């Protein structure tokens, strides 16, 4: 894999993590009463759907965002560019790449594919530092 591809993959994952973190911060601005309002839920769903469509492959994600709304709280965001750092980028086969990140207690692996000359995140896996096996994680 050349340096340009590596840089593109790095920027894709970092930008995705950053935008998801901003979305999580936005969601935390609402109190419980506001979150129960249909218009608030619609706006939150619309925002995350826009991020997913910008950075991820177009596929149905029944158990993942934007269909299943969840987000981390301040101090324990699901996506935090200050805590999640890229440690490895590998090409698994033509047009498929693994971008591995690390936080304080786990590894995350973003599976990126190249489709129609565009790089998109297809899925994500998780592995705690003490584990040997990757498990499916939701975007």
Regions found by a protein language model. Name each.
Residues 16, 86-89, 97-99, 110-112, ...:
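Hydrophobic beta-strand residues in large extracellular and virion-surface proteins
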Residues 1-65:
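Core segments of small alpha/beta cavity-forming domains
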Residues 107-138:
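Short beta-strand edge/turn micro-motifs at domain boundaries
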Residues 46-105:
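Surface-exposed, charged secondary-structure patches
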